[in-house]
Curated annotation (Swiss-Prot):
This is Sporozoite surface protein P36. Disulfide bonds join 57-90, 104-179, 122-177, 214-238, 252-333, 269-331. Keywords: Cell membrane, Disulfide bond, Glycoprotein, Malaria, Membrane, Repeat, Signal. It comes from Plasmodium berghei (strain Anka). Involved in sporozoite infection of hepatocytes and replication therein. GO terms for cellular component: cell surface; plasma membrane. InterPro entries: 6_CYS_dom, 6_CYS_dom_sf. The keyword GTP-binding does not apply. The gene is PBS36. Residues 1-29 form the signal peptide. It is found in: Cell membrane; Cell surface.
Amino acid sequence: MKQYEFARHINTYFSVAQNMLFSIFLYYAFSLLIFLSIFVFKMRKALYSLLFYMCICLYIYTPVFMASLKEIEVGNYFICNLKDYPTGNCSVNHDYNKTIKLLCPIIHNKNNSDKTYDPSYCFKYDGIKDEFIINNKQNYIHNTLPGVILKSHIENDTYNLSIYPPFVVKEDITIVCICDSEKGNEGITPYLKINIKKAHGLNNDLEGDYIKGCDYGNNKGKYQFLTKSIKYTIDPICEIHAYPGDIVGINCNNYTTKIQDVSLEPNSCFGMVYFSILTMVFVKTNVNNVMPNAKYYPDLASHHGNQNSKMFLTAYLLIPNEIERDILIYCTCSYNGNKGLAIYHIFSTKED
């Protein structure tokens, strides 16, 4: 898993560095061109004044995102950098093809623990009143978006949060994820606002009301988002039949009852899965070794030291439109040594 994780980090950092260096080059190249024009050519005073004014404006009004960007769109990532902009905010329209990331400063001694990003800091957006964002933290994010995934880890004294909305959203909704205010800016709440459109599958082509999948958290009613909500003590084996273009999911946690000693295995499912071809001999492998164009949520990079793993034990797999052969994969929900086995029969052709 580490080699895939390392490759994703390298690609992201390289793209960001490339964009920054290119912007810096254009900025100074244009400035240098203006100065050279002044000394090389004999120009009228009006043109001289105009170019000089343009040069001053460049230095004053060009955003200082050359060294530190607040909003970065690179590859399949949208990154809101509130670590370097502790009084700022970002806004983004959700796109399933992009991973949304939020960087927050860690305010030590602000809370009882700074070991993880507090998931209650993400909630339904109810607007701004008197220049303050309306705090709706008591409305837990799962009440608003069952099946949402928040993954966080700490890197360079910064909370690195990845946000994955579910594939079934009953109505247009806006959520916000906030950061703690730094000392001296207590009256200002930095936040990321995410606008999410009503969705019924990736392309609004979902058959039925839920994503195909096994929910060993047994969430039902308004919390249900997968087709099979079951208890591992009653149904230790859950089987799903899936076809090219389908989305499948797994969940291990219950949203209303705290379950002790629960984990998703592999912890990077569906990035890593147990795989077999028509036999019951399974090997652990990256899913892209089996289905090269498959997409999985969350991505492997989001599992790096994730501190919210006990609360968001959910994953999704987008099966490519074409696969070469029938395959069998599985992940498990582990409960203090007992397991719920989620088996996915993925067929190369859809049944008539």
